[in-house]
Structures are given as C-alpha cells and as structure tokens.
Amino acid sequence: MAVIKCKPTSPGRRHVVKVVNTDLHKGKPFAGLLAKKSKSGGRNNTGRITVRHVGGGHKQHYRLIDFKRDKDGIPAKIERLEYDPNRTANIALVLYADGERRYILAAKGMQAGDKIQSGVEAEIKTGNAMPLRNIPVGSVVHAVEMKPGKGAQIARSAGAYVQVVARDGAYATLRLRSGEMRKVPVDCRATFGEVGNAEHMLRQLGKAGAKRWRGIRPTVRGVAMNPVDHPHGGGEGRTSGGRHPVTPWGVPTKGYKTRSNKRTDKYIVRRRNK
C-alpha cells in the first residue's frame, strides 16, 4: 500500500493525497452479493430533509457483507480483496469449502489465498471469528457484536479495533479506541485482528468536487445564514453569532452532552476520553 502525493499541475491536484493498494481486485465485484442502493438525497418519505449535506454522488451498488460470521466449522479461503465504496475498509471475497461465497471485512495483513474459519474450534488467527467467551483476554479484535446473533456493530471502519481486557461471568469488558470501557455479552462474536486499510486516514481529497463525487454537499456556517434559517443568522455585516454555539434547532453544541439512553448506561464501565 502506497501513499502518493500528486504533483501540483492544477489547483485541484495541488493538495491531493492518494492511498493506492495494488492488492485490490481490478475487475467487477461478485454479482451474487450485490444489492440495489437507492439515493435519498437526505429526504424522508415526506420529502423533507432529515439529513443535511447529503445528495448527488456516483451511483453505487451495496455489497452484502457477512457481519454475523455464523458459518461455523467450514474452512474458507480468501479469493481476493476488493474496494467497497460504501465504507472506509476494504472487503474480502471468501470461498467456503461447500462452494458458498461471502464478503467479509478485510483485516490488516489479510491476503488472497489465506485460510479462515468461524466457530469455537477455529484457531487464534487474524480473520477467524468466534464468541468472546473463547477469545483470550488481551486479544485485539474487530467486527464485534453488541447482541448475540445480531451482527457486528463495533470496530468496522478502516484501522479500527478493540481490546478484550476482562471477562467476568456473562459479560466481557472491551476497551474501545475512544477510551470507553464497555461490557458485551460473552456469546457475542468478534473477529481477530484489526480492520485493514488504516492508511485511509492519510488521504486528502484535495478539492470540493471529490466530496461531491461521494455524495457530500457543502456545509454552510450558521452565521452566514438568515435568521429564518439558523439561530446564528442575520445581523448587519459580519457577526460572531451573538450566543453560545447551537445547532440549527437550538441545541447547544461543541461539548454539550446529548446521550440519553439510560437503558444501556449499565454496560458502560468508563466513558470515553474527552
């Protein structure tokens, strides 16, 4: 994997930094694991904007990823690594011994030809998945479930991982990258190793158009709007906003705590680092 800084042959190329991975498959994705992906433009079923800064972008297919890793006891081989436009991580096409193919997240160091397996009898090796009750304390894992059988929800983006720091009774304690310590049922599954493509954080798009290709629309500052559009809007000439920073709906921002899920508070041993 190489990080390439483009020559400044134009203003749009001057700040571009690319991450090039020559190991990725250059052809089309596996058709049997693709699904239609419709664009919403950030609108809900009534046509109103519910997510700002969304719209346009290149047409994409969704890749059906196996986040459950529940095909136990059947060895599999990594056929190839692929780019996935729907996530920061790369994905791997896996061929099981019974002929089935699935996509999984590509772990750090994973290559075509590697052998992987799921289940309690799998060895401790990058890419293998098993319940947390069978994973040694101190192990680094990714693609961790929060509810048994629901599918991975934690540590799925490029370079992400969590560490198993303790196991007591029905729960295992995980240390997340944010510093948060969280309890998860020991029957939840996780995959050994880190998510690959950690160099993704080094890339620079270099121009506004590259954001638009990805379906990301501009972000307008509140102080540049009219009073009807934002609490910071209006005024004669340039203003500072005149109040503490708030969202367009008047909720304080920049450090204001908004977490209100008391039902799951008991699973958080320590809040994330500030």
UniProtKB/Swiss-Prot annotation:
It comes from the Bacteria. The keyword rRNA-binding applies. Residues 223-274 are annotated as: Disordered. GO terms for biological process: cytoplasmic translation. GO terms for molecular function: rRNA binding; structural constituent of ribosome; transferase activity. InterPro entries: NA-bd_OB-fold, Rib_uL2_dom2, Ribosomal_uL2, Ribosomal_uL2_bac/org-type, Ribosomal_uL2_C, Ribosomal_uL2_CS, Ribosomal_uL2_dom3, Ribosomal_uL2_RNA-bd_dom. Transmembrane segments: none annotated. Keywords: Ribonucleoprotein, Ribosomal protein, RNA-binding, rRNA-binding. One of the primary rRNA binding proteins. Required for association of the 30S and 50S subunits to form the 70S ribosome, for tRNA binding and peptide bond formation. It has been suggested to have peptidyltransferase activity; this is somewhat controversial. Makes several contacts with the 16S rRNA in the 70S ribosome. Part of the 50S ribosomal subunit. Forms a bridge to the 30S subunit in the 70S ribosome. This is Large ribosomal subunit protein uL2. It comes from Shewanella sp. (strain W3-18-1).
